[in-house]
UniProtKB/Swiss-Prot annotation:
It comes from Rhodospirillum centenum (strain ATCC 51521 / SW). HAMAP family: Ribosomal_uS14_1 (MF_00537). InterPro entries: Ribosomal_uS14, Ribosomal_uS14_bac/plastid, Ribosomal_uS14_CS. Gene3D superfamilies: 1.10.287.1480. One of its GO terms (cellular component) is cytoplasm. Keywords: Ribonucleoprotein, Ribosomal protein, RNA-binding, rRNA-binding. Part of the 30S ribosomal subunit. Contacts proteins S3 and S10. Disulfide bonds: none annotated. Belongs to the universal ribosomal protein uS14 family. Binds 16S rRNA, required for the assembly of 30S particles and may also be responsible for determining the conformation of the 16S rRNA at the A site. PROSITE patterns: RIBOSOMAL_S14 (PS00527). This is Small ribosomal subunit protein uS14.
Amino acid sequence: MAKKSSVEKNKRRRKMVAQQAPKREALRAIARDRTLPPEERFQAVLKLAEMPRNGSKVRIRNRCELTGRPRAYYRKFRLSRVTLRELASTGQIPGMTKSSW
């Protein structure tokens, strides 16, 4: 089980990313637009640098929904490999069966 503080910190980051995403994307578009004057583009870069770091998408860590485990994460199920295996073996994931050949 992951530390509760780590899980909560990640939730706060997700919320902040959702709030900051439109403004951040607009500033990035201005900074990348080669048709604009360099001064305007540079100002957009400075404003982007002033924004909170936790508003950046790359700061989010994928974690298991049940345990909070940060590693061995399956995106499709939003679970870690350990939790996925436990739930699959007890038949709690619809359509998932143990393979045999």
